[in-house]
């Protein structure tokens, strides 16, 4: 039995295919979803989506949004998303270093909040590349 997973941004479809299982980062922690999961709607945090296809795990960096799960259908609408395999490791590492520097130079609450969000996004992209398959 499988799940139909659709990952969308406002501009494009990132993924639309059948999967065996997912592990999703929500605002209240990670959840695993298998076929016949109870219906839920949840906020999606900045974090990693792990997708199992048969014996292979894939990763995606998700940049916050919403998910709807029910009837073996999962729809995830996020601000932005990238497959781990599509992320350039050197560019992601540079972005992480810049985000860390910007956070240390942030002045005031607004700059600190924006710099912290940029750092979370950068760390998520690096993690999507480096995550070890289950």
Curated annotation (Swiss-Prot):
Bilayer topology: Peripheral membrane protein
Keyword Ribonucleoprotein assigned: no
Subcellular location: Plastid, Chloroplast thylakoid membrane
GO CC terms: chloroplast thylakoid membrane; proton-transporting ATP synthase complex
Keywords: ATP synthesis, CF(1), Chloroplast, Hydrogen ion transport, Ion transport, Membrane, Plastid, Thylakoid, Transport
SUPFAM superfamilies documented for this protein: Epsilon subunit of F1F0-ATP synthase N-terminal domain
Gene Ontology MF annotations: ATP binding; proton-transporting ATP synthase activity, rotational mechanism
Chief localisation class: plastid
Primary role: Produces ATP from ADP in the presence of a proton gradient across the membrane.
HAMAP family membership: ATP_synth_epsil_bac (MF_00530)
Oligomeric and partner information: F-type ATPases have 2 components, CF(1) - the catalytic core - and CF(0) - the membrane proton channel. CF(1) has five subunits: alpha(3), beta(3), gamma(1), delta(1), epsilon(1). CF(0) has three main subunits: a, b and c.
Family: Belongs to the ATPase epsilon chain family.
Record's protein name: ATP synthase epsilon chain, chloroplastic
Organism per entry: Liriodendron tulipifera (Tuliptree)
